[in-house]
Amino acid sequence: MGKWLGDRIAEGMPAHELGVFVRSSGQLRRARAAVKAASLTAVELSDKVEITAGRVSIGAMHLAKGLEFRAVVVIACDDDVIPLQQRIENVADEADLEDVYNTERHLLYVACTRARDHLLVTGVEPTSEFLADLA
């Protein structure tokens, strides 16, 4: 991921045109590491949209809505991360489970569609079952 981000910079893309999204704040460490590996600086997104010149925006998928970047990396699309296992374990009935799956799938979709020109989606094996939906 760090090399991929570095390649975008080498192509002349400004750092603030890059976004890195994860499922939840628990994976932000992985996003920071990817940005650092590219010798770049990150700014963590919050509920207030704060794109900062010269910095790669990182944040949880739910913060991606309404944003656009020339290049986006969606990382940590691991089987136990998306759908978020904690949400699945807390489901009381089948209808709620379907809602959880739909919400989780929608979060991934929103994060991926923030990319205008370049998209990289990564995960470790076993990867999220939702990645097949992107093909």
Language model: regions and residue ranges:
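Helicase P-loop NTPase motor core
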Residues: 1-42, 47-50, 64, 100
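Conserved helicase C-terminal RecA-like lobe
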Residues: 14-16, 29, 59-124, 132
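Conserved beta-strand edge residues that scaffold enzyme active sites
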Residues: 49, 125-126
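Short, conserved active-site loop motifs that form the nucleotide-linked donor/cofactor pocket
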Residues: 56
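A conserved SF2-helicase RecA2
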Residues: 129-135
